C-alpha cells in the first residue's frame, strides 16, 4: 500500500473511532439524566421501572393528603382516572398544591409500588395542566376534554 494512502486510511479510521467513542459517551451521560414520565396506571401495572428516577403525574385525589404533625412528611395519592398511586414526599409542598388539582412528581417507585418523591410540582394557574398529565388524562378517560383540569374526574377508581 502506498504510504500516502495508508496515512489517509489511518486518519479516517481514527476519526471514525473517535466519533464513535464521543457518541457513546454522550448517550451514556444523557441516559443518566433522563426522567421518563409515567401516569399512575402505568406505575401500578408495573410498566414503570422500579429504582431509577422517573416522573409521574395526575390529579391529587381529594381527601388523600396526610401530613405528619412532627415533620414535613406528606403522603397523598395521584390518579389518572384509571388507577391511583400513593406518593410520599418530605419537604415543603408548592403553594398551589391542592387536592383535586394536577401535580407532577419526580422520584423513584419502590418495590411495594409507592412513589417516593424528591420533587413535587403543582400546576400554576386554573387553566394550565402539565402536558404529560393532560395527555395521560385524555388517554385514560376516552379523551374527555374536561379532564384537562381534573374536574369531573371519578376519584373512586
Curated annotation (Swiss-Prot):
It is a single-pass type II membrane protein. SUPFAM superfamilies: Heme chaperone CcmE (SSF82093). Its main location: membrane. Pfam families: CcmE. Disulfide bonds: none annotated. It comes from the Bacteria. GO terms for cellular component: plasma membrane. Belongs to the CcmE/CycJ family. Heme chaperone required for the biogenesis of c-type cytochromes. Transiently binds heme delivered by CcmC and transfers the heme to apo-cytochromes in a process facilitated by CcmF and CcmH. This is Cytochrome c-type biogenesis protein CcmE. It comes from Saccharophagus degradans (strain 2-40 / ATCC 43961 / DSM 17024). The gene is ccmE.
Amino acid at each position: 500500500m502506498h504510504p500516502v494512502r495508508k496515512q489517509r486510511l489511518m486518519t479516517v479510521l481514527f476519526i471514525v473511532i473517535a466519533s464513535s467513542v464521543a457518541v457513546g459517551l454522550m448517550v451514556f451521560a444523557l441516559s443518566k439524566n433522563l426522567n421518563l414520565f409515567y401516569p399512575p396506571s402505568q406505575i401500578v401495572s408495573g410498566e414503570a421501572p422500579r429504582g431509577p428516577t422517573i416522573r409521574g403525574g395526575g390529579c391529587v385525589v381529594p381527601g388523600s393528603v396526610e401530613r405528619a404533625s412532627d415533620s414535613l412528611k406528606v403522603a397523598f395519592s395521584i390518579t389518572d382516572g384509571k388507577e391511583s398511586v400513593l406518593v410520599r414526599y418530605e419537604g415543603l409542598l408548592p403553594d398551589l398544591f391542592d387536592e383535586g388539582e394536577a401535580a407532577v412528581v419526580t422520584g423513584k417507585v419502590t418495590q411495594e409500588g409507592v412513589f417516593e418523591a424528591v420533587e413535587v410540582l403543582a400546576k400554576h394557574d386554573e387553566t394550565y395542566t402539565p402536558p404529560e398529565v393532560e395527555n395521560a388524562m385524555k388517554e385514560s378517560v376516552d379523551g374527555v376534554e374536561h379532564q384537562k383540569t381534573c374536574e369531573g374526574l371519578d376519584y373512586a377508581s
